[in-house]
């Protein structure tokens, strides 16, 4: 059985010209006449034509506009203080703030590989309000060349904000590049991540 993979904005981008099948599984959109009988309309009568208005409605434009409206009206859209990731590189310190509120320190792995820090989080399937869910993410950030890799630290605040930080050294000193794991410590107080 072949599976059609498409971007969700353009599920019906070509309207009636798109070779749609009932098994494409566009749940929640309703069925259109060409979903049930794609070739029947032209085989019954050669004079049958679908209305232009119906073609425009089915073409995906209305879906695109609806999707854009929902994206623009989400509370986090365009609001930098609700951004879950923040990377800051000051003169004397490099800091990464990452929102990982669905993970415990045991679910997180932080490693330094040469000039990169890799943060991986995974928890097995567990029950939440809507059913069962499992989550996994993998982030990779390039460390500035002057970060002292022997003094890197990582902590998880009570509100689920992971803070990875490391001091910078003067340009004449060697920062040291090796692979090592960074333990994640738990803090009892909420994060003091900047809101801008």
Swiss-Prot record:
Output the lineage of the source organism: Eukaryota, Metazoa, Chordata, Craniata, Vertebrata
Positions of glycan attachment: 185
Where in the sequence is Phosphoserine found? 45, 145
Origin species? Mesocricetus auratus (Golden hamster)
Q: Where is the composition biased (Basic and acidic residues)?
A: 176-190
Instruction: PTM N6-acetyllysine: list the residues.
Output: 93, 122
Gene3D superfamilies named in the record: 2.60.40.790
* Chain positions with N-acetylmethionine modification: 1
Deamidated asparagine (modified residue): where? Answer: 124, 146
Binding-site residues for Zn(2+) 2, renumbered to this chain:
130
Q: Give the similarity note.
A: Belongs to the small heat shock protein (HSP20) family.
Note the Pfam families from the entry: Crystallin, HSP20
Q: How is it modified after translation?
A: Acetylation at Lys-93 may increase chaperone activity.
Its name, as the record gives it, is: Alpha-crystallin A chain
Q: Which GO terms describe its biological process?
A: actin filament organization; apoptotic process involved in morphogenesis; embryonic camera-type eye morphogenesis; lens fiber cell morphogenesis; microtubule-based process; mitochondrion organization; negative regulation of apoptotic process; negative regulation of gene expression
Q: Name one GO cellular component term.
A: cytosol
> What keywords would UniProt list here?
Acetylation, Chaperone, Cytoplasm, Eye lens protein, Glycoprotein, Metal-binding, Methylation, Nucleus, Phosphoprotein, Zinc
Q: Which PROSITE patterns match?
A: SHSP
What is the role of this chain?
Answer: Contributes to the transparency and refractive index of the lens. Acts as a chaperone, preventing aggregation of various proteins under a wide range of stress conditions. Required for the correct formation of lens intermediate filaments as part of a complex composed of BFSP1, BFSP2 and CRYAA.
């Amino acid at each position: 059985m072949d599976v059609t993979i498409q971007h969700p904005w353009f599920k019906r981008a070509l309207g009636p010209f798109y070779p749609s099948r009932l098994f494409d599984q566009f749940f929640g959109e309703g069925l259109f006449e060409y979903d049930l009988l794609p070739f029947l309309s032209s085989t019954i009568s050669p004079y049958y034509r679908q209305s232009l208005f119906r073609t425009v409605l089915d073409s995906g434009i209305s879906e695109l506009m609806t999707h854009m409206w929902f994206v623009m009206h989400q509370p986090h859209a365009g609001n930098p203080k609700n951004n879950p990731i923040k990377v800051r590189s000051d003169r004397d310190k490099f800091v990464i703030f990452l929102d990982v509120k669905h993970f415990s320190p045991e679910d997180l792995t932080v490693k330094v590989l040469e000039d990169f820090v890799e943060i991986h989080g995974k928890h097995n399937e567990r029950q939440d309000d809507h059913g069962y869910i499992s989550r996994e993410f993998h982030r990779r950030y390039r460390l500035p060349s002057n970060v002292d890799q022997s003094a890197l630290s990582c902590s998880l605040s009570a509100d689920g904000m992971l803070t990875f930080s490391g001091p910078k050294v003067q340009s004449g000193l060697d920062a040291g590049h090796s692979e090592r794991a960074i333990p994640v410590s738990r803090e009892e107080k909420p994060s003091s991540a900047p809101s801008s």
